[in-house]
Amino acid sequence: MQSNPGLFMFLIFMLAPTLGWTQDHLPLANAATAARIRVNDPQETQTYFGDSQPETASDTRYATIDEATGPFVPPEPGTASLDPIVQPLPEYTDLSSSEEARFASPFSNDSSQFDIGLNLYSAPPFAGGLIVFGPNVAMKIGGFVKADFIYDFNPIDSTDSFVTTSIPVDAPPRTNSRFHARQSRLSFDTRWLSDDRVVRIYVEGDFFSEDDQFRLRQAFGEVGSLLVGRTWTTFTDVAAAPATLDFEGSVSNVNRRQAQARWTQMIFHEDLKLALAVEDTRFIIDAPTGITGEARNPSPDFVGHLRLDRERAQIQVASLFRVVGFQPTGQPVITRSAWGLNFTGVYLVTETTKVYSQILFGEGIGSYRDLPDAAPTAVDQGGLLPMFGWMIGATHNWNESLSSNFTYAQNDLGTTAFQNPNDVDQTTYLSANLIWSPLERVKVGVEYLYGTRKNVNGAMGDAHRLQASFIFDLP
């Protein structure tokens, strides 16, 4: 994996004006010195800045910066030392719950009663931890290191995630071991107040790309009801996503992130939310044999969902509509209308147990699961493929440090008589795990995975996998 030190410096210089830092405040004079910042404890009700005086000299509930090679010493009131520059600290900032609420974004789902067990889908909560403050602005730096140790008992071509469509049929027996840390993640959540409104920028990336290069997962701006940028599609429901250690997840879950412009609005009462979005589109077609051409996207994806939130339950109905096309070489574009519906639900059985479910169906939506949207229906014709998927699962906290998740899902893609007989017809996915948190922000887990693949001609293959993961969360 190649390092990119310029990326960090670029982010610092881009964010410095937003955070109210000027050239006088940037410690550039001494490259040999490094900054050490004491992270605020979210349990504390106050953080001391400016002229506020700690109760004792040993009280370290405030930020300070000193030389990395020197002792951690309290600064003079109102200053922090970074030889040879003396920096003024920001104005007094209260990190109590009221401060967290001050920067709360109305539709960003910072916290949820459904966050039971492992949650690698949502942004880190904007409270405590590694937060940088400036005048009327705050930035949370989040992320984690995740190391995966994988052993496959059967052939599967996707060694880093459990993609059941990559299970070969009638392959000779083989086993495989794989260690990687590609799911490790880094995020920057910046918020400020403008005319009594919270403006938010969120950028997130990981290393799950070719050659382990840093890649973009999410990048969006949000103010009030408007969100613009790349994030989870409006067609999905993060609250109903399975808590798996496996990166891929269930075969029916819509785990797709794409560029979009979304408007979210409460209707009738605060428990009912309507979201409407125009999103980027992708069309995958298996063209008839002997016909050359290109897939076309005449329209974006028009997506919406209606979500009902209650104290112990959440129900969401999502829909999408789009126009897709194929242009044979030298001929006009042939278009079809594709659609889909996604029903999801989450229910808190107890304070430590939740169950979730999903039903997904439509025509021409296979690409939302990296499958074909259309296939040949005759020698020189094609049509949209129907798809039907479903999932059930449960997550349980055994105690404060031990949790488990169970998920089973199935996805069926329609077939035609003119398809390649080795194309995918049906996939299934089963996951069961046990996750232990021996220390704060440290998790160790083991997960069993089983999947099947059935082809159009009826041939089947299956795979068993065992995965162990170590996760270290940023504060």
Which sequence ranges carry the predicted segments?
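Bacterial N-terminal signal peptides that target proteins for export
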Residues: M1-F8
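Bacterial N-terminal signal peptides
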Residues: M9-T18
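N-terminal periplasmic/intermembrane-space "pro-region" immediately following the signal or transit peptide
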Residues: G20-F153
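Outer membrane beta-barrel
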Residues: L130-S161, V169-I284, R296-S299, V303-Q314, ...
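Sequence/structural signature of outer-membrane beta-barrel proteins
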Residues: I150-D152, L193, D206-E210, F235-D237, ...
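Detector for outer-membrane/organellar transmembrane beta-barrel domains
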Residues: L308-V424
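Outer-membrane beta-barrel "beta-signal"
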Residues: W436-P438, G461-P475
